[in-house]
Amino acid sequence: YEMSASLVGSEMCIRDRNLMNVVIAIDSFKGSMTSMQAGLSAATGIKRVYKDAHITVRPLADGGEGTVDALVNGCDGRMTQVQVTGPSGHPVVCPYGIVDETHTAIIEMSGAAGITQVSGEEKNPLNTTTYGVGEVIKDAIQNGCRHFIVGIGGSATNDGGVGMLQALGFGFLDKNGNQIRFGAKGLEDLESITTDHVLPELKECTFRIACDVSNPLCGEQGCSAIYGPQKGATSTMILQMDKWLAYYAALAREQFPHADAKYPGAG
């Protein structure tokens, strides 16, 4: 980045010695550099060539890692955090943003159910859960938030958001009336969905999803087939999860007519 930025800086000097304002906004590089690290590195390169440049570095994100930082920075929000259930069932501390003026929470799914939070044998979408995401939403509601922006990139999960909804009071029950197990494997036992104990404040809430893909829930372009391998799924797991998610989607649509597994981005 410093080398490329130096070249850019040199070109700017040649074109116009008075051009001193530079805005840098670079998305993060998974597993290597955050958005701000990349931006500051580029800024260092520019400064080496054009010492008088006025440089503004801003975080940028696509719905995955860095989304909270980018939006909180741009919306004059503040950061808070809460301990929740991580993707493998162990506690994790999830930071999220709050914009008090609009009662809006900005949440990264990757902060509570992220692929970087699992390793080795824990990297298995049959077992990983989104329960912690629901716990973050619940905490934000208790902090007065009624509007939510949720970035869904970078997750370690493939449970169709069931864990998240369980944390918010939805019942996903097996044939014996018990909550199904965490992870995609729990969907194999799903028989019914109940709403008797749903958090009542959810009726007052709005949700917007930050996402840069258009995959449907199931099929050759669905979440299991496209994103399952990077989450640790084998070819057998992919077929199983796709089948279970299709049944889950059909069951959900019976109760919630607007639920559409083919909606772009549902996967």
Range-by-range predicted roles:
Residues 1-16:
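Single conserved hydrophobic/aromatic residue that forms the stacking wall/gate
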Residues 18-152, 156-267:
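N-terminal loops that bind phosphate or other acidic moieties
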